[in-house]
A protein has these predicted regions:
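Conserved, mostly hydrophobic/aromatic
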Residues: 356, 441, 453, 478, ...
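Exposed beta-strand face motif in extracellular beta-rich ectodomains
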Residues: 115, 193-195, 570, 769-773
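Metal-dependent phosphodiesterase/phospholipase catalytic core, i.e.
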Residues: 256-388, 397-411, 420-422, 513, ...
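C-terminal active-site rim and adjoining tail of enzyme catalytic domains
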Residues: 252-332, 373-472, 476-479, 625-721
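Sec-dependent signal peptide recognition
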Residues: 2-9
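Extracytoplasmic soluble-region selector
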Residues: 710-799
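Bacterial Sec-dependent N-terminal signal peptides
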Residues: 9-58, 214-215
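Extracellular glycan-recognition regions
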Residues: 44-262, 353
């Protein structure tokens, strides 16, 4: 069997597009800290260096395999049989509970050392619950005595919940086992289910997973300079439905933790990150989680006056540090020095900053696990136009970043929300010292703020109500709206939009004649009743299908884009289900055709497809679909999340189970955004995660959110009378867009305002003068679940 290769390509820059804003801007306040242009406006970045895409050595589903290849080996000591049947590989080890039945892959895999093995399997029958199946890796060749020993194996017992349910074991040349690690899985292996077991090994580091959930992370005691791969059973019949072997390019991190930053426990849900430039004198504020430095070629940390503060190595060695660094990198020599330093130090929990997208891309390629932020704070020529917003998103993604630091004049709610819909994490940069300007910035919903005055922002947020939402959680219609119409149909997408969804998610495959079509499963059986593989059909054949529910046609992505682009505020969440790399350029062609880059992002469970995206569609955001890590510590789980998101320069899109407020808060301080799925009848989980400020929620029931109040509109200025409670006439807007006149009687009075008294939430000024207030609105979703919105500051002239 030949080892196949995924090809990589660098294509031309994306055709930029954009859209008009759907958010109204009624503020008459002056712009926050306008700055003079100091650098030229950015051009769309065309990446010079491709992201390395791992080679796929084997991807076999056994459908077309009629006999076991001659290059595959069966050990002579096999107790049972290995055979093919009904499109699957079977290892029947029931003949003996302890003597193995194994199959070894071709000898050519011996030359490999660093790889990922994914096996989809089921235990059809077992002699007892203690029997097991396994993945063999780092095995010797058939010339060894005994053959193929020594090797490591990931063994999974039928009764996987036992203390030895999962094992990492070393098979020794003496035919004895050395069990290196034991652990229990959360459930026993159900004979009616198919599971996925994964081994990722690089150097002496290894990770084991079941169904993409990490179950072991350790270092191997012996490197075993060999690469053999195989499968094995003892005392059970194992069916293997899919076997995939992929090159592992990146080393697995040695550290399992991140910096333990201070949790200020603010009442604001998922409060924005506060970062502070390194002060010229004295210490940084304890309210800042990040400190910004310049980084020179000798890896010295410099303040804004280019004065040395300390060496990066000293910063890393400070065990009492509770802050994270923002390090501005200016040239490739610095990257070379960072690469050398990374052999002894873990730089995963650092953020490297530059205003050059190509330089940041080089940082990420040199340090694949690092985090980067594109600094456009001085690009004052950019506008809030559709074209410029897409350009910002494009260049942020091309730089392999998720964070972009905006120029002050673009720190507007309509710009911020558009970038967030495109899975970009926008930060503000400001030198403001006034509470009014700080309040203006906070109500834009930015994810982070780089400021010389973090205390001003922190104190303001401390005075807000519990579960304050400064940024609206986005509602994504899962496959449209399956609760009301058939999934992955055009009608379902349009219905989701009708009830107020911010985005529509749909799954795509590519037909054998090259058309991108919507389908969740790789077969059409479940949704249409016709037992065909979607990628073995032509478009004409797909056109003949009808859904079982409402007899809907299976749409093409072309048809969906045609309709969705009529709603500029709605985003296409395009989930790549196909394993075929050719679907990515096909998606690019459709986005080009419809000029839909301002409304489109791509998500996938496949890391290979996401990396392929970085070369073919480098300007389009990606989301990595996965599960929430399950370690007992939020510090460790945050590290797991960073390992996933920073590797793929993607958002974190997990199944919502196990996703806690504390974990999301800790990871969001590092620029991670959360897009959990799928909420159905579990309304309490949805309500909980909404009031916690989750960035986006994917649901089958988008219509349940239609009446949520999501926006407040108030005048920029009013007059009030001394001694009378202040009332402000304004407007509320629901998720579906319904506007209602509302009299605001509750408000937050900002510091430096005229004297006032407060009875309950009613505010009465006791002297003439000027004040600034933030009108507030509290909405109750259900018992025990409510949130508070604040409007932008209103100037009050008291007479």
């Amino acid at each position: 069997m030949k080892i196949t290769h995924l090809t990589t390509a660098i294509l031309l820059a994306l055709t930029l597009s954009a859209c008009s804003s759907d958010d109204e801007n009624t503020s008459t306040q002056p712009p926050v800290n306008p700055e003079e242009p100091t650098v030229p406006d950015p051009e769309p970045e065309t990446p010079e260096q491709p992201v390395p895409v791992p080679e796929v050595y084997l991807d076999e589903n056994f459908d077309q395999m009629t006999e076991i290849p001659a290059t595959w080996s069966m050990p002579r000591s096999n107790a049972g049989t290995v055979y093919l049947s009904e499109g699957s590989l079977f290892l029947d080890g029931r003949a003996n509970d302890t003597q193995m039945t194994s199959v070894m892959l071709p000898q050519e895999y011996q030359k490999l050392r660093n790889y990922r093995i994914d096996m989809e399997f089921a235990y059809v029958e077992r002699n007892n619950g203690g029997r097991w199946g396994s993945i063999i890796y780092r095995a010797a060749d058939h010339y060894a005595e005994p053959a193929f020993s020594p090797y490591y194996q990931f063994a999974i017992r039928g009764d996987a919940t036992g203390a030895s349910g999962l094992e990492l074991a070393l098979r020794q040349p003496t035919n004895a086992w050395n069990v290196l690690h034991k652990s229990a899985y959360k459930e026993n292996i159900d004979p009616t289910k198919t599971y996925k077991a994964t081994v990722i090994v690089h150097g002496k580091r290894v990770r084991h997973y079941i169904n993409d959930e990490l179950v072991l992370d350790t270092s191997l005691p012996y490197s075993l300079d060999q690469g053999g791969i195989g499968l094995s059973t003892a005392g059970l019949l194992m069916r293997v439905e899919q076997l995939k072997i992929t090159e592992q390019l990146d080393a697995l991190p040695e550290s399992n933790k991140v910096t333990d930053i201070i949790d200020h426990r603010l009442p604001v849900s998922m409060a924005p990150t506060l970062a502070q430039p390194a002060p010229l004198t004295g210490n940084a504020s304890v309210n800042a989680t990040h400190i910004a430095y310049q980084l020179d070629e000798q890896l010295n940390l410099l303040n804004a006056n280019n004065q040395k503060v300390m060496h990066l190595r000293d910063y890393l060695n400070d065990s009492n540090r509770r802050t994270l660094p923002l390090l501005t990198v200016k040239n490739e020599n610095t990257i070379t020095q960072l690469k050398a330093l990374s052999t002894n130090y873990d730089l995963t929990d650092f953020t490297f900053v530059s205003d050059q997208a190509d330089l940041l891309r080089k940082v990420r390629l040199a340090l694949p696990s690092s985090r980067t932020a594109l600094d456009y704070s001085r690009h004052t020529g950019l506008t809030h136009s559709r074209k410029d917003i897409v350009q910002i998103a494009h260049n942020t993604n091309s730089s392999l970043s998720k964070i972009v630091i905006l120029p002050s004049h673009l720190v507007k709610q309509e710009v911020v929300s558009h970038l967030q819909r495109l899975l970009i994490t926008p930060w503000a940069s400001t030198n403001t010292t006034t509470p009014v300007s700080a309040a203006q910035i906070l109500t834009t919903g930015v994810n982070g703020i780089l400021t010389t005055q973090p205390d001003t922002f922190q104190n303001l947020m401390k005075s807000m109500a519990p579960n304050t939402l400064l940024r609206k959680p986005l509602i994504t219609g899962h496959r449209g709206i399956p609760a009301l119409d058939d999934e992955n149909t055009l009608e379902s997408m349009l219905k989701a939009i009708e009830v107020g969804a911010d985005a529509v998610e749909y799954d795509v495959y590519i037909t054998k004649d090259g058309h991108v079509v919507l389908m969740h499963d790789d077969t059409t059986t479940r949704t249409t009743g016709v037992a065909r593989k979607i990628e073995e059909m032509t478009l004409a054949e797909v056109r003949e299908l009808r859904t079982l529910g409402k007899q809907r046609q299976i749409p093409t992505m072309d048809e969906v884009l045609t309709e969705v682009t009529k709603y500029p505020h709605v985003v296409n969440f395009i989930e790549i289900k196909s394993p075929k790399p050719e679907i990515v350029p096909a998606i690019k062609a459709l986005l080009d055709q419809h000029d839909a880059y301002d409304q489109s992002i791509v998500i996938s469970f496949s890391g290979a497809q996401i990396l392929h995206m970085k070369n073919v569609l480098p300007g389009v955001s990606t989301g990595f679909l996965t599960n929430t890590p399950t370690a007992q510590s939020d510090i460790v789980n945050t590290r797991r999340i960073l390992d996933a998101t920073q590797q793929y320069s993607s958002t974190f899109n997990p199944s919502f189970g196990g996703l806690s407020k504390e974990l999301m808060t800790l990871a969001s301080q590092r620029g991670v955004t959360f897009w959990p799925w799928t909420f159905r009848l579990n309304k309490e989980d949805f309500n909980r995660m909404y009031v916690q400020g989750t960035h986006g929620l994917t649901t089958d029931y988008a219509h349940d959110s239609s009446n949520l109040i999501v926006k407040l509109k108030t005048p920029a200025e009013i007059t009030a009378t001394v001694g009378k409670p202040v009332e402000i006439s304004g407007q509320t807007t629901t998720q579906v867009g319904e506007k209602t006149t509302y009299i605001f009687k509750e408000m937050l009075v900002l510091p430096q305002s005229a004297k006032y008294t407060q009875a309950g939430q009613a505010v009465t000024f006791s002297e003439k003068g000027t004040a600034y207030v933030m009108p507030r609105y509290n909405y109750t979703m259900a018992p025990n679940y409510s949130y508070t919105l604040y409007a932008a500051p209103v100037k009050v002239t008291i007479q």
